[in-house]
């Protein structure tokens, strides 16, 4: 596996980083959730992600929204990406732990940067009738998050 770098760099003294590589989650849903939580305070983002996991709050889908129904609130189309939200919640907790290790207070921080990049494709084959086989590939995602102190 190649070394993955962060797509942006912020002030190292006032920020903390976390990265998840080759996660088995949807790239499209990851993009929409990254867009939804960027700029939130860490407490609000943690509560939002927990609400998504228990299907209480929907994530607005701006790009990948064909044949999606409307949801409650100010959004038009939305979904409940539970698997992506649980992985993003782990990433947020990791970033908060890194902030505590650096001597920062995670209660006074916000999500300054989130990004997703497609990871490698895990190739697989599914046996079919009459000796044939069909490809069954698994997409992976690399997530990154940087939290920074509120100025």
From Swiss-Prot:
GO terms for cellular component: cytosolic large ribosomal subunit. One of its GO terms (molecular function) is rRNA binding. CDD domains: Ribosomal_L22. Pfam families: Ribosomal_L22. Keywords: Ribonucleoprotein, Ribosomal protein, RNA-binding, rRNA-binding. Belongs to the universal ribosomal protein uL22 family. HAMAP family: Ribosomal_uL22_A. Part of the 50S ribosomal subunit. This protein binds specifically to 23S rRNA. It makes multiple contacts with different domains of the 23S rRNA in the assembled 50S subunit and ribosome. This is Large ribosomal subunit protein uL22. It comes from Methanococcoides burtonii (strain DSM 6242 / NBRC 107633 / OCM 468 / ACE-M).
